[in-house]
Regions:
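Walker A (P-loop) phosphate-binding loop of P-loop NTPases
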Residues: 79
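P-loop NTPase switch/communication element
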Residues: 39-50, 87-138, 184-187
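P-loop NTP-binding catalytic core
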Residues: 1-68
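Walker A (P-loop) ATP-phosphate-binding motif of ABC ATPase nucleotide-binding domains
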Residues: 71
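Conserved lysine of the Walker
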Residues: 82
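Hydrophobic anchor at the beta1->P-loop junction of P-loop NTPases
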Residues: 74
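Conserved, well-folded catalytic cores of nucleic-acid-processing
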Residues: 1, 25, 38-41, 51, ...
């Protein structure tokens, strides 16, 4: 629905393109439409090295992190390539492992034969029926994932992800908005506190 009563909308087109629109007068000088077209394929780690995005040494370290089933977060600013790097790293996961990806809006497309994807859902026009990432993380844990992936950690789901990583779910990963690696703990703390704010007193 896109009209005066609901002047903005997020949707996904049949080819996977994400569509966002805001009507005037909220948008100036007029109605704005944004399209986010998904990549048709995933870059490999080797291609990221060849393009100069990663050094060979960094690639070896990241490959070892994946092979040893260590938990990790890819952090960076908006448009810095977090999803691109995470998809490339997930493509290194052994083909017999089950990768369960949880996202608010589907973006990750790792080149892996055993990927299960769960995607959040906004509320309908009556305000009902929403399914958030936190709920989907809990559902994913019931699917016996070899790798639990949260495409973008940006809320209270960080609590469930960290709990899973500390109770035997090795190799879990995700992305997180942060200006530097040093900022990551503070971001995680802020997301955890957002859960506290939502609790009834």
């Amino acid at each position: 629905r896109l009209d005066e009563g609901s002047p903005f909308v997020d949707a996904r087109l049949p080819d996977g393109t994400r569509f966002h629109a805001v009507l005037a007068p909220l948008a100036r000088p007029g109605t704005l439409v944004s399209l986010r077209v998904p990549r048709t394929r995933t870059f490999t780690v080797a291609e990221l090295v060849a393009s100069g995005t990663l050094s060979a040494g960094t690639a070896r370290v990241l490959e070892a992190v994946v092979a040893r089933r260590l938990a990790f977060l890819v952090s960076g600013g908006t448009g810095s390539g977090k999803t691109t790097l995470l998809a490339a790293l997930l493509s290194l996961v052994a083909p017999e492992e089950r990768v369960v990806v949880v996202e608010d809006a589907s973006e990750l497309r790792p080149d892996h034969p055993h990927v299960v994807a769960l995607e959040g859902r906004p509320p309908n026009i009556e305000g009902a029926g929403a399914v958030d990432v936190r709920t989907l993380v809990r559902q994913a844990l019931r699917m016996r994932p070899d790798r639990l992936v949260v495409g973008e950690v940006r809320g209270a789901e960080v609590v469930d992800l960290l709990a899973a990583l500390n109770t035997g779910h090795e190799g879990g990963c995700g992305t997180l908005h942060a200006n530097s690696a040093l900022d990551v703990p503070a971001r995680i703390e802020a997301y955890t506190l957002s859960l506290h704010d939502a609790l009834p007193i």
